Amino acid sequence: MTSVIKRDGRNVPFDEGKIEIAVSKAMAETQKGIEEDVAALVAKAAKDNFTDKESVTIEEIQDFVELELMKHSPEAAKKYILYREERTKLREEGWQMSDLQKDIYNNKYRYDGESFEEFIRRVSGGDDFIGKAIKDKKFMPAGRILAGRGLDKFGKKITLSNCYVMPQVEDNIESIFDTAKYLARTYSYGGGCGLTISKLRPKGAHVRNAANTTTGAVSFMDLFSLTTSLIGMRGRRGALMLNMDVSHPDIEDFIDVKNNLEKVTSANISVNINDEFIKAVKDGTDYTLHFQVESTGEVIEKTIDARALWHKLAKNNWNMAEPGVLFWDRINSWHIMSEDKNFSYAGVNPCAEEPLPAFGSCNLSSINLSEFVKDPFTDYARFDFEAFEKMASAGVIYLNVILDENTNLHPLPEQRKMSDDLRQIGLGIMGLADMFIKLGITYGSESSIKLIHQIGRSLINSALRQSALLAKEDGPFPMYDAEAVLASPFIQANADEDVLELIKEHGLRNSQLLTIAPTGSISTLLGCSNGVEPIFQISYTRKTESIHSEDRYYKVYTGIVKELMDKMEIYEEEDLPDYVITTSTLNYKDRIEVQAAWQQYIDASISSTVNVPNEFTIEDVEGLYMYAYDMGLKGVTIYRDGCARGGILITDNKKSSADKIQELQKEIDEIASTELKQNPDVCPMCGGKMIHSGGCAECTSCGYSPCSV
């Protein structure tokens, strides 16, 4: 016998050692324990029994092992039979899930006790190809689709869009409170929101009311943050991103606002950086902050040292992991609609992967790259481009169907109109780090960057091609301007010749196609790495709590690492191959270069967190952000291990949660311990530990994520 036919039809080499391992596991459950000679005898008997056959099914081997084991250890045979029955049941019911994955599935996405098959049918809409892709963990819609698709039939008002952007707040009291109302309504349907506050006049500007002067743009951030914290979204809080242009006179107060843990507790914040400011930083010159009050003509200006403001921004990121930076001119210049004079972005969504116009929204789904590796963990492992391109095309079709279904599920009429006019979708990827490990490629190496370019170009052209074919059938999106789209530098740089001809002939059905979301919850559900991120760590420590005895801590390996160790029969971390690297061992420049390679092919943006070590300096942060700008990123966030914001994930040789909280109390304004529950690094649902990755955060205990993508 030379090969074994797996249940999915794949032929794999026969491995006698795997039979020994399976038998040993069954024997370990008996009173006698493992008898290595018996395990070896059973494995050899299986090999000898099928000598004359070129290939044999996995079921035939297991049936034989069952009978052979009965001769040597009936008790072990019984355990083996029970194990097979349990695995069969799991295959029939769905994925094999950890407790955390079950919590995510049951509490976030499963509706009213539906079976796994019912869940698949509901989410796929009965599309067999999509349903199988989800089952095979090759494709996963975003959280709002998983949670809400089909529930309108039961009278539920749940949007299928993960994210929205509001119009910029106008400089008057009516607009400020209308915006709070828009936020509340959108949160009640399950959508997260982005909001730019750059049109609000700065502190000290004159107003025509009893106050005489305004408290400034920053003072209204807490109103929007409070609205976000009050409106629930099916067991989770709302999600909000607040932005301010770097040229606003209140920018220094904006950068500092999160130094007080009582301020803006329910929002992410980012600074919109323009090219002019970057040039001033590089040249070491002054930069003018400018605001003109539209209603009165009053001009407020302030000249600052550009490098001093850049340093303040870096220092706050070093200390508090916020604000993030958005390179706004690049965001505006690198997308399908960049040359359309009637189109403009108003802000970004809560995790910053989606720049959107006023009242814009986006439906999201992601392709799991790691499941497109053929013969993983072998010398002949390779990426299946044909299957990937087929999946990408199907993903575009799927998201267009979702977009149509969602028309009447948007919270606001303006959102419905914008969705119909622009037809923006967001197909992305996850499982990048897992894919590299399966291929034996080091994340950030030249080989990895080369492969990203190949996959990225394949992805954008598959998406453009399918969108053009949909336009052939149903017409281009209503705001389509052929001259502007064809003049887009993004289209000119990325569209293959045949795809460009299709666009010229039929137009595009969608004004936006690709994005890379943090995929925190859905990647955890599938058990793969999130977004474009490297794996966070090789292993982590889990705690089992006991009422009657001391709590116990035990080591759990990250999914892909455990899979590699099992396949390659590795028993110690020290023996892992060099290409298994984590956020703590990866050079930040390599991490930036990976994201830069992807950004070339992504017309929206990429949600990203660069995790850096504790010893990373403020000057290092400045260098990282400038390198990100120079490499062509649209935005980036950092998270420094041990920063004052308080990452309290317990790993080997780390301080306890109590110690971290105690330090946090001392470091930031002596805030009372009762207020620490609002710390973004402590889960607001269960008090567990939050991991920062992919431009978002996720609880390691209950799976809560403010992004829920």
Language model features by range: what are they?
Residues G703-V709:
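Short Cys/His-rich micro-motifs in 6-15 aa windows
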Residues P74, K79-E93, I273, S333, ...:
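Terminal amphipathic helices with adjacent charged low-complexity linkers/tails
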Residues C683-C686, C699-C702:
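Short cysteine-rich clusters marking metal-coordination/redox-active sites
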Residues R10-N11, K32-D136, P141:
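Core nucleic-acid recognition elements
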Residues S161-F385, N408-K417, A463, S467-K472, ...:
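Active-site cavity-forming subdomains of large catalytic enzyme subunits
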Residues A180, Q292, M391-R416, D420, ...:
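Internal maturation/activation junctions in enzymes
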Residues A346, C351-P355, L399, L403-N406, ...:
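Catalytic alpha/beta core of large soluble enzyme barrels
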